[in-house]
Amino acid sequence: MSYKEKAVKGVSWHLLSYFLAAPIAYLVRVLYANEIPKLDVGLFYAVLDFFSMLVVFRAFGLDQALIRYIPKYLAENRLDMLKSSIVFVGILQTILAFIVAFLVVIFAPYIAEFYINNQGQFTGRLDLVINILIIMAMGYYFLDSIVAFFSNILTGFQLQNYASSTRVVRILSVFIFSLIFIYLFNVHNAYVPSVSYLLMAVVMIIIYGYIVVKKIFPKFAKEKVIFSRKLIRNLFSYGMYVMIGYAGSLILGYLDGICLTYFTGLNAVADYRNVAMPTVNILSYFAFSVGAVLFPMSSELWEKGYKKALSYGVEKVFLYSLIIVTPLAILMAYFPTVIINILFNPKYLSAAPAIQILSFGAMFLTFNSIGFNILNGIGRPNISTKILYIGASFNLIFNILLIPKFGIIGAAITTVFGYFIMWIFQIWFLNKLLEHQFLNKKWILVILVGIFSLIPVMFIKDLIDNVILQLFVCGVVYFGIYILGIFGLKIINIYEVKDIISKIIKR
């Protein structure tokens, strides 16, 4: 199988999983928005953000090092080193996750009183906050570390069909358990998502533990485990850079939720984390799908010295990602209230301005997701780390400055500018390392086509009263004009698109 076919196959699996998981994820959020009090929804996401910030301490970057070294040892046919890497990372990651979870359980009363309830919204109900912290610590945080370990093994072996399926199984399990608790047991509070996430982790450990043991371990079951200094040094030297970088990405991804919890309260967290961010993050699904494939594949291409092939592939990925994300971002920025009314309810209309602002950052988020996977794949996690900390430092400073005064709008503005600053540095390093100029005039043409395609929509919108029909008609008109513009200006080649589609169908 050629690298192009392998890439198309891998991306297709991940896109399919996002296509299946995204509607379910939205159903989960719609369910919570309509069946659980907004304050309890905010509580759950505040606790989830808290544990997400602690994820960096449950593996010290060794999970990502595993993805980096599995294809390397496979290419070198070093099955002994491969098995040793998996065993070492698995043991250490499990121990670290348990220690952190145990410490959170011990200090749960203090975390609940002085952080989660800083605005006094759960005064008199602190027992609920403490219980949610304990459930998420021992359930979601600890057990999910084992799920992540299995998922990273599958990704490292480039078994993209299994790796991508974790996305669907995860959210589907949460959805099913949430339905059971709400409609069968009549539970309507923060226990619903918390316990659902715990049970989801149990289900996934059973399923993917079986797949890993059945599909992968027989290949090197007879190999001895060797804990050599070189192996441990390689894993830690790569993993520590990734860990430091991952800490930066966590600051970028969750610091806004942390600051909103502390400075503005849990209703703002519900707006931002249950509506605004998830809505805009849909736009990055293509980039995440591509990135999951490019990480191990770029590692393999780089190890074999195929720099030109890698550069060509990255250029195409950037262009196609921009073409896909641009129209969706523009429409999302133009119809935020329509989207909220259709998918959620009027209680969450206060999230509309944040959606508009974050939509413009979706393009930079897309590029950054792809670029970081490339940098990590070619063995430059130190560069990723530097860029991430530039963005994280910006976010840290401006979240503290803007959120107390502007709330979720301040969080959204900070996030978008953080993405943009990182993209500037990232594209410069990629141009230098791969000796290729990625930024070109086609990118500008794509954005211009996206903007001008909106003009007819502005006139059509006011002619239709029904919001669903309005969104449908405007979407059809917009995409029709946009596609004509993309092919009319020869930004992409129709024959190449047909070639990609044919490869997807064959798979």
Swiss-Prot record:
Superkingdom, taxonomy of origin: Archaea
Record's GO cellular component terms: plasma membrane
Keywords on record: Cell membrane, Membrane, Transmembrane, Transmembrane helix
Residues that span the membrane, as ranges: 8-28, 41-61, 86-106, 130-150, 171-191, 193-213, 235-255, 275-295, 323-343, 355-375, 387-407, 408-428, 444-464, 467-487
Transmembrane helix recorded as keyword: yes
InterPro entries on file: Poly_Biosynth_Transport, Polysacc_synth
Topological relation to the membrane, as annotated: Multi-pass membrane protein
Entry's localization field: Cell membrane
Protein family (similarity comment): Belongs to the polysaccharide synthase family.
Full protein name: Uncharacterized membrane protein MJ1068
